Swiss-Prot record:
Acts as a regulatory subunit of the 26S proteasome which is involved in the ATP-dependent degradation of ubiquitinated proteins. SMART domains: JAB_MPN (SM00232). It comes from Schizosaccharomyces pombe (strain 972 / ATCC 24843) (Fission yeast). PROSITE patterns: MPN. This is 26S proteasome regulatory subunit rpn8. The keyword Metal-binding does not apply. The keyword Transport does not apply. CDD domains: MPN_RPN7_8. One of its GO terms (molecular function) is metallopeptidase activity. It comes from the Eukaryota. Belongs to the peptidase M67A family.
């Protein structure tokens, strides 16, 4: 399906908007800090990449925004703050460009078109993403929109309106790990059960198995000549393989021999680790016993010499008393 084009400006309308979890977390955090418990909404800027068909929203930041609840046409947006933030984000990551703006809605407002027109001075084709910070049903908390000029059939003056765009939540592997840790830390510990923990471990192992399968398929296609050799990817894989323990030192003879050798190497490694822990415990016990014997000897010597112990700077010292 070819991408849609707005009539007056000949602007390509994006076909999909991808929102990363970091954007959702930033919007919720800004809402909880400044607008929680009120009817106010939070407005912010979206950063990422726009290749025409797909808008990838990877980062965001909130901006000062005020509006009159009774009169929707009265609002204030601090564009000076936005300009200063843009300069700082350029220094952090030059690949993240201004792609649009967001607010916490949860629906379109009458002033959204005016705000969108203002932001066009800084963003050529801004995308609006409404983030529902308090969703009442299960589903995506985002709705994406794009402003176009709609021409009437009777030839009258065109009107500007928002069209809905498909949106999705996608994350890179590092973001997935971060979100999993965040959910694990915020989840009520009393609710967790053994079945829940086992399920989480099974899902993690399933994800790891899927990644390993993808790597094996890629290497197989490279060997068969279906894909070109990418030395950067091979270098990354080699660095991963170098972290694995060197289990086999001799020639490989059979699968059964491999299993027995792997089991033996694993047992030896486990025994070495347990031995290190055991020796460390013995050393700590000997040191503690040595300190105890020193303390007893010093105390006995003080009693025999009628020396009164004093403590200075955490150290025991003795001052002898003169006998009459």
């Amino acid at each position: 399906m070819p991408p849609a084009v707005s009539s007056e400006t000949s602007t390509i309308v994006p076909q999909q908007v991808i929102v990363h979890p970091l954007v959702l977390l930033s919007a919720v955090d800004s809402y909880n800090r400044s607008a929680k418990g009120t009817k106010r909404r939070v407005v912010g800027i979206l950063l990422g990449q726009n290749n025409g068909d797909v808008v990838n929203v990877a980062n965001s930041y909130a901006i000062p925004f005020e509006e009159d609840e009774k009169n929707a046409s009265v609002w204030f947006l601090d564009h000076n703050f936005m300009e200063s933030m843009n300069e700082m984000f350029k220094k952090i990551n030059a690949n993240e460009k201004l792609v649009g703006w967001y607010h916490t809605g949860p629906q379109l407002r009458p002033s959204d078109l005016e705000i969108n027109n203002l932001l066009k001075k800084y963003i050529p084709n801004p995308v609006l993403v409404i983030i529902d910070v308090k969703p009442k049903s299960v589903g995506l908390p985002t709705n994406a929109y794009f402003a176009i000029d709609e021409i009437e059939d009777d030839g009258s003056k065109s009107s500007r309106t928002f069209v809905h765009l498909p949106s999705s939540i996608e994350a890179e592997e590092a973001e997935e790990i971060g979100v999993e840790h965040l959910l694990r830390d915020t989840r009520d510990a009393s609710v967790g059960t053994l079945a829940t923990r086992v399920t989480q471990q099974a899902q993690s192992l399933q994800g790891l198995g899927q990644r390993l399968t993808e790597i094996a398929d890629y290497l197989r296609k490279v060997v068969d000549g279906q894909l070109p050799i990418n030395h950067a990817i091979l270098a990354e894989l080699q660095s991963v393989f170098n972290l694995l323990p060197n289990i086999f030192s001799g020639p490989v003879v059979s699968e059964q021999a491999l299993e027995s050798e792997a089991q033996r190497a694993f047992n030896v490694n486990s025994n070495d680790q347990l031995m290190s822990i055991y020796i460390s415990s013995i050393v700590r016990a000997v040191i503690a016993l040595h300190d105890l014997l020193d303390s007893l000897a010093a105390s006995k010597a003080m009693e025999q010499q009628d020396i009164k112990p004093t403590v200075q700077n955490g150290e025991v010292s003795a001052n002898a008393e003169q006998k009459a």
